[in-house]
Amino acid sequence: MQNNHLQLEQLACQRGDKILFTDLNLDAKSGDFVQIEGHNGIGKTSLLRIIVGLSFPAKGKVRWNKIEINKNREEYQHNLLYLGHLAGIKPELSAWENLQFYQKIGNCRQSEELLWDILQKVGLLGREDLPAGQLSAGQQKRIALARLWLSNAALWILDEPFTAIDKQGVNVLTQLFEQHVENGGIVILTSHQEIPSNKLQKVRLDQYKFFDQGNMA
């Protein structure tokens, strides 16, 4: 995997008249594993949406390999895997069909044998043919997380990936994240849980809180 570099420069986020955070700088390079921390409402999800290009910052820039992401969107999206709060799966399709669909549209490894291996890893063997809409919220979350094992993307942006996942699942995912960064990837995530990794760097959004109210003009 080539060396990559994500830069957040003087980012500020505003929701209505409230400024959630300001003057946030972050350099994440190949091999970095970053956890965004902060209390509810501080703007963790908003920050991730800015990083992936789904929202715009009140000020500041996001760069991928020194180029602003809005000027290099196709290459950036090719290198990006984003998993948000919602599972983002098709409920009418089975777990197997959802993963096959993702293989077709994403930057993914193509292997039927790999699909079986992933279904076993996420505990869905025996349920692979059931419509995803008939599965529990935790099982639907596992379908979404299964994309991680398929993805060739360098940059993983994950919003609360451990929600509805048991302790064993947390350990399995953490090992996967560590393997990804060891291979030159970048992982940025939010989580309220303690993550069992000594590779983790933590960023507290509270440090960038803007206490006065007003516009960023």
UniProtKB/Swiss-Prot annotation:
Coarse class of the protein's main subcellular location: membrane
Enzyme class: translocase
Known catalytic reactions: heme b(in) + ATP + H2O = heme b(out) + ADP + phosphate + H(+)
SUPFAM superfamilies hit by this protein: P-loop containing nucleoside triphosphate hydrolases (SSF52540)
ABC transporter domain segment(s): 6-216
Subcellular location as annotated: Cell inner membrane
Transmembrane segments: none
Gene3D superfamilies on file: P-loop containing nucleotide triphosphate hydrolases
Catalytic activity, EC: 7.6.2.5
Residues the entry annotates as binding ATP: G38, H39, N40, G41, I42, G43, K44, T45
GO terms of biological process kind: cytochrome complex assembly
UniProt GO MF annotations: ABC-type heme transporter activity; ATP binding; ATP hydrolysis activity
Keyword Cell membrane: yes
Keyword Magnesium in record: no
GO annotation, cellular component aspect: plasma membrane
Swiss-Prot/TrEMBL keywords: ATP-binding, Cell inner membrane, Cell membrane, Cytochrome c-type biogenesis, Membrane, Nucleotide-binding, Translocase, Transport
Topological relation to the membrane, as annotated: Peripheral membrane protein
Family: Belongs to the ABC transporter superfamily. CcmA exporter (TC 3.A.1.107) family.
Primary role: Part of the ABC transporter complex CcmAB involved in the biogenesis of c-type cytochromes; once thought to export heme, this seems not to be the case, but its exact role is uncertain. Responsible for energy coupling to the transport system.
Assembly: The complex is composed of two ATP-binding proteins (CcmA) and two transmembrane proteins (CcmB).
UniProt-recorded name of the protein: Cytochrome c biogenesis ATP-binding export protein CcmA
Record gene name: ccmA
